[in-house]
């Protein structure tokens, strides 16, 4: 329950329209609570340019959109060019890990061995496995086999066998920047049903990418993914999705794949997030009752698949960062 002072701060009393900048001049409070820079101040993006020559019009557009009721990301979520370069350096390691796994994974390999590959490759290339220790997670990677939707914990006992499909979800920290992507691997010869699920899930990610329009909406992506999955007779997990990432492992926004076009956060250039739908062969319901507190399975025990990419919105579309 809020006390009176908290309620007052949250809007029951009128807030001033202006606050003092560092130089003592008055600045308008922007939609995200920050004070608008002075025209001749150095821009917040790190370009070294004056604000009026850089992001002033951009910020005014954001402010106007927010005041019409649009869900506009705070500018703190928008990645600067320097931050994007840092994320790319992290992603180079993350992509390299998954490429290494692609060359070595196969029947007879334990998921514990996959975890060791991830840890060794990442640390040898100057990175840190982002999964390791995150909210108590015990391993360096997630390995989700067949009916495991996500957060499969590597184990000596889980030996990959002919006909399995497995998602390897890898995340890296390097120089303080985060990257994240996952791939599906077919172990030996798999059934047509499993192969089709893996293929369609990857195609669904591309449908989501095709739906991206700068200044469009996050819901456009989820709607495109969901429609394609349903066209092919599959269902989409509601409880898990993509997320913002870059300076932290999990940032806003949550990227749902059960959405309507024209809804959700505005896709503002600089917004960085993942697209990672979890698509089930059967029903969408999931089982989160595993005693380890992490591993999620399909409720009906049928196979599931997931591919994940990380991207940043640009002025003319998007740039893939990790895959």
What are these regions, as identified by a protein language model?
Residues 1-77:
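Acidic/negatively charged segments and metal-coordination signatures
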């Amino acid at each position: 329950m809020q006390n009176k002072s908290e309620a007052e701060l949250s809007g029951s009393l009128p807030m001033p329209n202006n606050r003092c900048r560092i130089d003592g001049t008055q600045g308008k409070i922007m939609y995200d609570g920050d004070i608008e820079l002075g025209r001749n101040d150095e821009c917040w993006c790190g370009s070294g340019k004056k604000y009026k020559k850089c992001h002033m019009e951009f910020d005014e557009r954001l402010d106007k959109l927010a005041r019409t009721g649009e869900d506009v990301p705070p500018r703190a979520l928008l990645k600067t060019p320097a931050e994007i370069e840092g994320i790319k350096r992290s992603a180079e390691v993350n992509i390299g890990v998954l490429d290494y796994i692609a060359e070595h994974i196969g029947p007879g390999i334990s998921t514990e061995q996959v975890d060791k590959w991830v840890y060794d490759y990442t640390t040898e290339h100057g990175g840190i496995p982002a999964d390791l220790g995150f909210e108590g997670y015990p391993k360096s990677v997630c390995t989700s086999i067949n009916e495991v939707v996500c957060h499969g914990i590597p184990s000596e006992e889980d030996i990959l066998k002919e006909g399995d499909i497995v998602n390897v979800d890898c995340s890296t920290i390097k120089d303080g920047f985060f990257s994240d992507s996952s791939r599906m691997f077919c172990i030996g010869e798999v059934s047509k049903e499993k192969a089709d699920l893996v293929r369609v899930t990857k195609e669904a990610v591309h449908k989501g990418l095709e739906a991206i329009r700068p200044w469009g909406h996050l819901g456009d992506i989820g709607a495109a993914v969901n429609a394609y999955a349903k066209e092919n007779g599959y269902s989409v997990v509601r409880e898990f999705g993509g997320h913002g990432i870059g300076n932290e492992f999990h940032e806003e926004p949550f990227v749902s794949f059960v959405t309507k076009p024209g809804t959700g956060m505005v896709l503002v250039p600089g917004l960085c997030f993942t697209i990672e739908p979890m698509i089930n062969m059967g029903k969408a319901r999931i089982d989160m009752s595993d005693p380890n507190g992490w591993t999620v399975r399909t409720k009906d025990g049928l196979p599931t698949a997931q591919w994940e990419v990380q991207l940043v919105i640009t002025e003319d579309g998007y740039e893939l960062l990790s895959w």
